[in-house]
Design a protein with these regions (language model features):
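Helix-rich interaction surfaces within compact, conserved domain-sized segments
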Residues: 42-77
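Generic secondary-structure microfeatures
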Residues: 7-10, 24, 33-35, 68-70
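A short, structured beta-strand/loop element
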Residues: 14-56
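Short, charged/polar N-terminal "headpieces" of proteins
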Residues: 1-18
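A residue-level signal for beta-strand positions that form part of recognition/binding surfaces
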Residues: 3, 28, 63
Length: 77
């Protein structure tokens, strides 16, 4: 895996911060951010996604909350 650092929360302290990397081999974004709280998880389940798709978060996945200003570090298509 060849990760390339794209950016970190500019307001970072020493407690960890939202960070974005790009996997140059797959084009995947790798994101470190805040764990979603129970209210966020409930809202995700309520809104849902595509018809016929479970609203439960599978064991091998998680939901994170990324501050909107971190989008500046996402690659442009």
């Amino acid at each position: 895996m060849a990760l390339r650092f794209l950016g970190i929360d500019p307001n970072t302290g020493d407690q960890g911060s939202p960070t974005v990397w790009l996997d140059d081999e797959t084009g995947d974004l790798v994101i470190q951010s805040y764990k979603a709280d129970a209210a966020t998880l409930a809202a995700c389940a309520e809104v849902g996604s595509v018809p016929g798709h479970s609203t439960d978060v599978p064991e091998h996945e998680t939901v994170v909350r990324l501050p909107g200003y971190m989008l500046q570090f996402f690659p442009k298509p």
